[in-house]
């Protein structure tokens, strides 16, 4: 059986989250949580919250052993971009793009 968790509109660039997401693909949940715990990135904290949620969703399925779960899919998609204006010299304005991410984590039994 598999369980999934999705976090939408997370205020971090998908490129930055993917750096961390590659480290936990295919790993057992306990090992993945340890990796995320000691990774000094903002994306690691966000991914660990989504992973905890996926494990909690798996607990709701009858007959699933939580200790035998492994990370099957970690998908980081681009969400909508917030556009802001940065005033510059001589009346110009630069555009600031504040990117968001949709993070999907799927766990399954080994």
Swiss-Prot record:
GO annotation terms (biological process) = translation
Q: Which CDD domains does the UniProt record give?
A: Ribosomal_L22
Q: Which InterPro entries match?
A: Ribosomal_uL22, Ribosomal_uL22_bac/chlpt-type, Ribosomal_uL22_bac/org-type, Ribosomal_uL22_CS, Ribosomal_uL22_sf
- This protein's GO CC annotations: cytosolic large ribosomal subunit
Q: Keywords of this protein's UniProt record, alphabetized?
A: Ribonucleoprotein, Ribosomal protein, RNA-binding, rRNA-binding
Q: What's an example of a GO molecular-function annotation for this chain?
A: rRNA binding
PROSITE patterns attached here?
Answer: RIBOSOMAL_L22
Q: What does this protein do?
A: This protein binds specifically to 23S rRNA; its binding is stimulated by other ribosomal proteins, e.g. L4, L17, and L20. It is important during the early stages of 50S assembly. It makes multiple contacts with different domains of the 23S rRNA in the assembled 50S subunit and ribosome. The globular domain of the protein is located near the polypeptide exit tunnel on the outside of the subunit, while an extended beta-hairpin is found that lines the wall of the exit tunnel in the center of the 70S ribosome.
Q: How does it assemble?
A: Part of the 50S ribosomal subunit.
PANTHER family, per database record: CHLOROPLAST 50S RIBOSOMAL PROTEIN L22-RELATED, LARGE RIBOSOMAL SUBUNIT PROTEIN UL22M
| Assigned protein family | Belongs to the universal ribosomal protein uL22 family.
- Mind telling me what this protein is named? Large ribosomal subunit protein uL22
Organism, per UniProt?
A: Maridesulfovibrio salexigens (strain ATCC 14822 / DSM 2638 / NCIMB 8403 / VKM B-1763) (Desulfovibrio salexigens)
């Amino acid at each position: 059986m598999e369980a999934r968790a999705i976090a939408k509109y997370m205020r971090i660039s998908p490129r930055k989250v993917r750096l961390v997401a590659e480290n936990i693909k295919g790993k057992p949940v306990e090992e993945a949580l340890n990796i995320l715990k000691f990774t000094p990135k903002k994306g690691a904290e966000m991914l660990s919250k989504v992973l905890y949620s996926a494990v909690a969703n798996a607990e709701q399925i009858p007959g699933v052993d939580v200790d035998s779960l492994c990370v099957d899919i970690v998908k980081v998609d681009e969400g909508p971009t917030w556009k802001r204006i940065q005033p510059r010299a001589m009346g110009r304005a630069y555009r600031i793009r504040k990117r968001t991410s949709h993070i999907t984590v799927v766990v399954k039994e080994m």
